[in-house]
Amino acid sequence: MKVAVIGAAGGIGQALALLLKNRLPAGSDLALYDIAPVTPGVAADLSHIPTPVSIKGYCGEDPTPALEGADVVLISAGVARKPGMDRSDLFNINAGIVKSLTEKIAVTCPKACIGIITNPVNTTVAIAAEVLKKAGVYDKNKLFGVTTLDVIRSETFVAELKDKDPGEIRVPVIGGHSGVTILPLLSQVQGVEFTAEEVAALTPRIQNAGTEVVEAKAGGGSATLSMGQAACRFGLSLVKALSGEEGVVECAYVEGNGEHARFFAQPILLGKNGVEEIQSYGELSAFEQEALESMLDTLRGDIKIGEEFVQ
């Protein structure tokens, strides 16, 4: 199994590469690519970690050597948020980066599963889909917006609030991956009850957790380490499912039946071909139903921007 990390010299990419080097199954190949010349050095550094995962780094304008033969491609390339920016402020730079990288994927490894980490995910996934469609290689079961960070934040904050082991908490998060489009389904957390006040406080905290980190880093970056962990969790789940393990479920932002929007995050059963089944997210509370309905215009607007960028 070959996994390619694109944008591997950045804060997320390096954290993700470190985790994958330690946690990918024995015999896996890990390819690191970034435009930055430091990338082969990042791979050399990680190659000294004694795990049965081979690693190679590539830099320069062309990601093709890193992409050749890849089963999974995780894209974290782009610029990070700074204080005062929201994820959509990143669009002007990151849209072009995702477009050109996806064009290379369409030619080099069109059958790979692609996980998009680069923000704004609500929009960059739509860009990737349109690029792949134009190239005649789009498979909606193999393109994912990685929203796992919203899930792990939800699990962490719920565990803290309720004094539970975070490893035992499961919180489905639906919708999109920015602001009001992030909807944690707190009503579905098993073995935990929330007051209306707790839900009203916890929901926006999860939605704005990225801003919390950006401000805490005081201009020194955004959420890179927790995002690296989230992307590793999703990447490893993909690898397990592609290898034939059954019952692997993660929330991700994918093209489904279009009930709410063309792309929508919800629980996904992963399989040998990517999305095996888009699972029902069950019944919503009145609070969640209202939040869902009020976010849809924002989400659909984000998607439209991505679609129009490629036209």
Curated annotation (Swiss-Prot):
Annotated catalysed reactions: (S)-malate + NAD(+) = oxaloacetate + NADH + H(+)
A GO cellular-component term linked to this record: cytoplasm
Binding-site residues, substrate: 81, 87, 119, 153
Binding site residues for NAD(+): 7-13, 34, 94, 117-119, 227
Pfam family, one: Ldh_1_C
UniProt keyword annotation of Metal-binding present: no
GO biological processes: malate metabolic process; tricarboxylic acid cycle
Enzyme kind, highest EC tier: oxidoreductase
Keyword terms: NAD, Oxidoreductase, Tricarboxylic acid cycle
An MF annotation (GO) of this entry: L-malate dehydrogenase (NAD+) activity
EC number: 1.1.1.37
InterPro entries attached to this UniProt entry: L-lactate/malate_DH (IPR001557), Lactate/malate_DH_C (IPR022383), Lactate/malate_DH_N (IPR001236), Lactate_DH/Glyco_Ohase_4_C (IPR015955), Malate_DH_AS (IPR001252), Malate_DH_type1 (IPR010097), Malate_DH_type1_bac (IPR023958), NAD(P)-bd_dom_sf (IPR036291)
Residues forming the catalytic site: 177
Oligomeric form and interacting partners: Homodimer.
Family listed: Belongs to the LDH/MDH superfamily. MDH type 1 family.
Function: Catalyzes the reversible oxidation of malate to oxaloacetate.
Protein name as it appears in the record: Malate dehydrogenase
Species annotation: Aliivibrio fischeri (strain ATCC 700601 / ES114)
